[in-house]
From Swiss-Prot:
The protein's Enzyme Commission number: 2.4.2.7
Pfam families: Pribosyltran
NCBIfam families: apt, PRK02304.1-3, PRK02304.1-5
GO MF terms, alphabetically ordered: adenine binding; adenine phosphoribosyltransferase activity; AMP binding
Taxon lineage: Bacteria, Pseudomonadati, Pseudomonadota, Betaproteobacteria, Neisseriales
Annotated PROSITE patterns: PUR_PYR_PR_TRANSFER (PS00103)
Name assigned to this protein: Adenine phosphoribosyltransferase
Keyword terms of this UniProt record: Cytoplasm, Glycosyltransferase, Purine salvage, Transferase
Group of enzyme by EC: transferase
Organism encoding this protein: Chromobacterium violaceum (strain ATCC 12472 / DSM 30191 / JCM 1249 / CCUG 213 / NBRC 12614 / NCIMB 9131 / NCTC 9757 / MK)
One GO CC term on file: cytoplasm
């Protein structure tokens, strides 16, 4: 859990960062399948000012916390997570799709918005008591985030908080994460999916 004394960026909507960054997220209808409104963060990442602003939001949120690792979910969580880990001067743990890691792994299966999958991490990626921030670009159904959380907990890590750029509240993933005992911080949300 994040310290109640370290919440300088708690209400981003009041500061209008959320609306500004949302303007740099592209919506792609019917991708990867019919009926899905894909939220594409690449325009936000391509602009150095918006990318810096996004990372600074997370840095200011976590810089006063004792964080040992940032764990990023495959694949866009790697982009945000590795930069955040660098800025916080801590290690980075990739949580990958099944079959992508070369060493001994631990695996967790989960349901996606449009199918089933599994994620895994190296068995030596963290140690008991490590304080970890878990990050991805988007929380839809919450399956990927919860799978990452379960992996880290299984390895004995203390997951301080989950973070994402976007939450899709209608799909219930944010609530699933919170109901699962994990605090969730997101920069913006979109109605509809």
């Amino acid at each position: 859990m994040i310290s109640k004394y370290n919440r300088p960026m708690e209400n981003l909507s009041n500061l209008d960062y959320s609306s500004y960054l949302k303007g740099w997220i592209r919506t792609v209808p019917n991708w990867p399948q019919q009926g899905v409104m894909f939220r594409d963060i690449t325009p936000l990442l391509q602009n150095p000012k918006t990318f810096r602003m996004l990372i600074d939001i997370y840095v200011h949120r976590y810089m006063m916390e004792k964080v040992d690792l940032v764990a990023g979910l495959d694949a866009r969580g790697f982009i945000i997570g590795s930069v955040l880990a660098y800025e916080l001067n801590v290690g980075f743990v990739p949580i990958r799709k099944k079959g992508k890691l070369p060493f001994t792994t631990v695996e967790e299966e989960y349901e996606l918005e449009y199918g089933n999958a599994a994620v895994e991490m190296h068995t030596d990626a963290c140690k008991p008591g490590d304080r970890v921030i878990l990050i991805d670009d988007l929380v839809a159904t919450g399956g990927t985030m919860m799978a990452g959380y379960k992996l880290l907990k299984r390895m004995g890590a203390d997951v301080l908080e989950a973070a994402a750029i976007i939450e899709l509240p209608e799909l219930g993933g944010g609530q699933l994460v919170r109901d699962g005992g994990l605090d969730l911080f997101t920069v913006c949300s979109y109605e509809g999916h």
